[in-house]
Amino acid sequence: MRLIREDSIEKHLVSEVRKIGGIAYKFVSPGRRGVPDRLVALPNGKIIFVECKAPGEKPTPYQLREHARLFALGHQVIVLDSQDLSSILPAVN
């Protein structure tokens, strides 16, 4: 059985988002631990924050804190631990 690594999930996300005309920015915030890995801008004007994880891995407490802050502001945060992008790409329609 081949293990899927977090970086391969992230690369797949970037590639598939690009195919539909979107952009998956690498999101880094110096001095702020736990921000999601990617800020995904989709063609319909929708913005989604995506936390990439290896299969079965869970967000850290710092990441959960940041997810809650973004959610409280009305943003969508998705934890992605597979190459199944159905929770992200339908947002284009």
Curated annotation (Swiss-Prot):
Protein name, UniProt field: Putative nuclease p44
Keywords: Hydrolase, Magnesium, Metal-binding, Nuclease
Enzyme type, top EC level: hydrolase
Regions crossing the membrane: none
Domain of life: Viruses
Function, as annotated: Nuclease.
Cofactor note: Divalent metal cations. Mg(2+) is the most probable.
EC number: 3.1.-.-
Domain VRR-NUC positions: 5-84
GO molecular function, one term: nucleic acid binding
Annotated organism of origin: Acyrthosiphon pisum secondary endosymbiont phage 1 (Bacteriophage APSE-1)
Cofactor(s) this protein requires: Mg(2+)
